[in-house]
C-alpha cells in the first residue's frame, strides 16, 4: 500500500505538471538562465596546491618554506644544437636567457651558460664573472677558450652544458606567487602558475629560437600545458559524448523528443550546477572538470530512456497522451528517484577525502545527478504532453506490451528460476574483481596516465631523459634549534652526507645546497686546486667565505641558507615520476635527515611530496 501511495503522489504531480506545463517550462528556462549567467564567475585552476584544504599540514609546511626560501617552483628550458659554443648559438642562448628574465612576470634569478656566478680567484681573493664575455668573439681560438672555461669546473659544467656541448640548461627561479585573493578577481583571471607557463611557452615557440630546439619544463610549464591540452581536448570529448548519446537515443527512442530532451537534461544540469558553483566562488581543477559532465550525460540518457519508454508503451496501449504522461510520472517517478538518490549518496562519499578536487567531484556530480532527475521527471513529461492523441496500437493492446517488453519479462522469469546459480557466478566474479582491485596503483605519472602521444608530455619526458634536464623537484628544509648553527662545519658535513644519499637514489638527477657555493669558493681561493673542493674545517672560515661571497656581489646563497643562519635547504631534482619509488625515496630521505639532524625540525616540501600525499589521501 505504501508504494501505491507514493505512486499516487507522483501521478498527482504529473497531472499538475501537465496542467501548468507553461509554468514548468518557464521555471526551467529561468533556472537555466541563472545558471548560465553564473558561468562567467566559473574559475578553473590547475595549481597542485589547490588540491589541499586550507589547514592541511602539507600546505602549512609549504607556506613556512616559502616564507623563508621563496618559491619552490622553477621554470627551465633545455636547448639542443650541434655546438652550443658557436657564436650564433651563444648569442641565441643569451637572448633566450635575457628574454626569460625580462618577460616572465615572476622571474627572480636565472642561471645559464651565459648568465652564471662564475667565481675566479684574484689578488684580492676572488671575483664573480661570466663564462661568456659581453662581446662574443668570432674566432675559433676565443670560442675554444670559452669552452675550456665552461668545463674548467666539472661541478659547474654538469649543471649547464652536456659533455658533448650539444645541450644546455637554463633554469629560472621564480618569485613567490601571490595568494588567490590577490589575483583571483574577475571572470578572466589567470593563476600565476599558469601565467608563468604560458609566458615560457610564448618565448620558446618564437621562430628565432627554433635553431636551439628549446623544450620547456618546470611545474608552472607542466600546469599551463595541461590546461591548454584540456582546453582543446574537452570540446572533442564532449562532442564525442554527445554524438554517442544521440546515436543511442535514436536507436532506442526513434523520436525527436526522445533525442533532444535527454541532451537538454544533460546540458541543463551541467550549466546550472557549474553556474551555481561559479556564484559561490568555488575553484575547479581543470583535470576534474569533465568528470561531472560525462556523468551528467550518462544519467540523463538513462533517466529519460526509462521515462520515454514507459510513456511510449502506455501511449500505444490507449492513445491518450495526457493520461499516458500522468501514468508515466506515477509509475516511473519513484523508481527513477530511488536510483538518483542512491547514486547521489554514493557520490557524496567523495566529500570524505580531504582534497579540494575530490570534494568538487562529490558536490558537482551528486548535484548533476539530482538535477538530471528533476529535469527529466519534469521536462520530458511536459514536452511529451504536447501533441494530439493517437489510436491504440492493436498488437500492443492485445499483448499488453511490445516485443522487447516480453523478452525482458522472460529474462526476469529466467533469473528467478536460476537464482542460486546466478548468485554463485556473481560471487565468484566479485571475488576475482576484488583481487584485481588490489593491483590498482594510484599514480600522477604523466607518461602512464596520459602517454607519449601527447606532444607536450613527450617533450617533458625527453627533457627528463636527457643528460641535463629535470621535470620535478622536492626540497628538504632543516630548521636547527639556534641561529648561526648552519655555519658549523659539523652541520654542513651532515648536509653533505644527506645530499650524497639523495644523489644515490634511482630518480635523482642532481642535488643543490649552499655547499655547491662554499666548496666552489673554497677551491677558487686555493688557486683552483680540486683537492679543496670541500667544506672548510672551522666556523670562522665558513663565515669569512660567506662574507667574501656577499661582498663580491654573490646572491645565489640566499636561496639555500636563511639570513639567521639557522635553516638549510636541500633541493633534489628528479627526471621522472614513479609513484612507488618516489614514496620510498621521500620516506628514506626524511628518515636520514632526522637521523643526521636529531635536534632539528625536518620538512619535505615541493610538488613531489604533494603528489605523494595526494596519492595517500585517495588510495588509503
Predicted regions and their residues:
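Membrane-water interface of transmembrane alpha-helices in multipass transporters/channels
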Residues: 49-53, 255-265, 280-296, 350-368, ...
Amino acid at each position: 500500500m505504501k508504494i501505491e501511495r507514493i505512486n499516487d503522489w507522483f501521478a498527482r504531480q504529473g497531472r499538475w505538471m501537465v496542467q501548468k506545463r507553461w509554468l514548468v517550462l518557464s521555471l526551467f528556462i529561468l533556472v537555466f538562465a541563472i545558471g548560465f549567467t553564473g558561468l562567467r564567475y566559473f574559475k578553473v585552476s590547475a595549481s597542485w596546491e589547490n588540491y589541499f584544504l586550507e589547514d592541511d599540514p602539507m600546505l602549512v609546511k609549504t607556506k613556512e618554506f616559502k616564507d623563508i626560501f621563496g618559491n619552490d617552483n622553477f621554470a627551465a628550458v633545455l636547448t639542443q644544437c650541434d655546438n652550443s659554443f658557436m657564436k650564433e648559438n651563444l648569442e641565441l642562448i643569451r637572448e633566450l636567457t635575457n628574454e626569460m628574465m625580462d618577460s616572465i612576470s615572476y622571474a627572480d634569478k636565472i642561471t645559464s651558460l651565459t648568465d652564471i656566478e662564475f667565481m675566479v680567484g684574484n689578488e684580492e681573493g676572488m671575483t664573480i664573472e661570466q663564462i661568456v664575455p659581453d662581446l662574443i668573439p668570432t674566432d675559433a681560438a676565443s670560442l675554444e677558450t670559452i669552452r675550456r672555461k665552461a668545463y674548467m669546473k666539472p661541478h659547474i659544467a654538469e649543471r649547464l652544458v652536456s659533455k658533448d656541448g650539444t645541450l644546455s640548461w637554463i633554469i629560472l627561479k621564480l618569485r613567490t606567487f601571490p595568494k588567490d585573493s590577490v589575483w583571483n578577481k574577475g571572470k578572466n583571471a589567470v593563476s600565476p602558475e599558469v601565467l608563468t607557463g604560458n609566458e615560457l611557452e610564448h618565448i620558446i615557440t618564437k621562430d628565432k629560437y627554433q635553431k636551439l630546439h628549446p623544450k620547456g619544463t618546470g611545474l608552472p610549464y607542466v600546469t599551463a600545458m595541461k590546461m591548454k591540452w584540456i582546453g582543446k581536448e574537452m570540446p572533442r570529448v564532449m562532442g564525442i559524448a554527445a554524438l554517442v548519446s544521440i546515436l543511442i537515443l535514436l536507436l532506442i527512442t526513434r523520436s525527436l523528443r526522445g533525442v533532444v530532451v535527454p541532451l537538454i537534461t544533460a546540458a541543463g544540469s551541467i550549466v546550472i550546477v557549474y553556474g551555481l558553483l561559479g556564484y559561490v566562488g568555488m575553484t575547479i581543477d581543470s583535470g576534474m572538470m569533465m568528470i561531472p559532465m560525462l556523468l551528467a550525460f550518462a544519467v540523463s540518457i538513462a533517466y529519460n530512456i526509462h521515462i520515454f519508454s514507459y510513456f511510449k508503451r502506455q501511449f500505444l496501449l490507449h492513445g491518450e497522451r495526457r493520461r499516458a504522461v500522468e501514468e508515466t510520472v506515477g509509475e516511473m517517478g519513484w523508481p527513477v528517484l530511488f536510483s538518483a538518490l542512491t547514486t547521489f549518496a554514493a557520490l557524496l562519499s567523495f566529500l570524505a577525502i580531504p582534497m579540494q578536487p575530490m570534494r568538487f567531484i562529490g558536490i558537482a556530480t551528486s548535484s548533476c545527478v539530482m538535477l538530471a532527475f528533476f529535469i527529466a521527471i519534469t521536462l520530458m513529461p511536459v514536452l511529451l504532453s504536447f501533441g494530439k492523441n493517437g489510436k491504440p496500437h492493436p498488437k500492443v493492446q492485445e499483448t499488453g506490451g511490445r516485443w522487447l517488453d516480453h523478452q525482458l519479462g522472460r529474462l526476469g522469469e529466467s533469473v528467478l528460476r536460476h537464482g542460486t546459480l546466478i548468485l554463485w557466478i556473481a560471487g565468484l566474479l566479485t571475488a576475482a574483481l576484488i583481487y584485481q582491485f588490489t593491483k590498482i596503483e594510484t599514480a600522477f605519472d604523466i607518461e602512464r596516465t596520459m602517454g607519449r602521444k601527447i606532444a607536450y608530455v613527450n617533450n617533458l619526458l625527453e627533457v627528463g631523459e636527457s643528460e641535463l634536464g629535470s621535470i620535478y623537484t622536492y626540497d628538504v628544509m632543516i630548521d636547527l634549534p639556534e641561529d648561526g648553527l648552519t655555519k658549523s662545519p659539523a652541520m654542513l658535513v651532515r648536509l653533505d652526507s644527506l645530499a650524497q644519499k639523495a644523489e644515490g637514489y634511482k630518480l635523482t638527477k642532481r642535488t643543490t645546497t649552499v655547499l655547491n657555493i662554499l666548496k666552489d669558493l673554497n677551491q677558487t681561493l686555493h688557486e683552483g686546486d680540486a683537492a679543496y673542493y670541500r667544506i672548510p674545517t672551522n666556523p670562522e672560515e665558513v663565515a669569512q667565505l660567506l662574507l667574501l661571497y656577499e661582498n663580491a656581489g654573490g646572491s645565489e646563497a640566499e636561496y639555500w641558507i636563511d639570513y639567521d643562519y639557522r635553516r638549510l635547504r636541500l633541493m633534489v631534482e628528479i627526471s621522472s615520476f614513479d609513484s612507488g619509488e618516489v614514496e620510498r625515496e621521500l620516506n628514506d630521505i626524511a628518515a636520514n635527515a632526522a637521523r643526521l639532524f636529531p635536534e632539528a625540525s625536518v620538512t619535505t616540501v615541493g610538488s613531489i611530496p604533494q603528489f605523494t600525499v595526494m596519492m595517500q589521501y585517495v588510495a588509503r
